[in-house]
Amino acid sequence: MMADFIKYPVTTEKSYLSMFKNKQYTFDVDLRLTKPQIKKLFETLFGVNVIGINTHRPPRKKVRAGLSTGYRPAYKRVILTLKEGQSIQF
């Protein structure tokens, strides 16, 4: 299913400000998605027109549980800019 590629929306103060000021929505998605795939995914799932896409991969953080160490799962963070007057309800 296509919705499985979207992990969750990012809910930080910075993402809320950009959502209301610039119509930019921030999501964490699967690492394997490319920008054209991300655009098609959001346009079909939410019925919006995506004007711009910015992506980056934040560094993985080290996690320690007892004596063993590991890393948190990697993800890709996406900032979507929508056409004026449109919004995503989540």
Curated annotation (Swiss-Prot):
GO cellular component, one term: chloroplast
Location, primary (coarse class): plastid
GO molecular function: rRNA binding; structural constituent of ribosome
One GO BP annotation of this record: translation
Subcellular location per the Swiss-Prot or TrEMBL entry: Plastid, Chloroplast
Domain of life where this protein originates: Eukaryota
Pfam families: Ribosomal_L23
The keyword rRNA-binding is annotated on this UniProt entry: yes
Keywords from the UniProt entry: Chloroplast, Plastid, Ribonucleoprotein, Ribosomal protein, RNA-binding, rRNA-binding
Quaternary data: Part of the 50S ribosomal subunit.
Role noted for this protein: Binds to 23S rRNA.
Protein family membership: Belongs to the universal ribosomal protein uL23 family.
Protein's name according to its UniProt entry: Large ribosomal subunit protein uL23c
Organism: Tetradesmus obliquus
Gene that produces this protein: rpl23
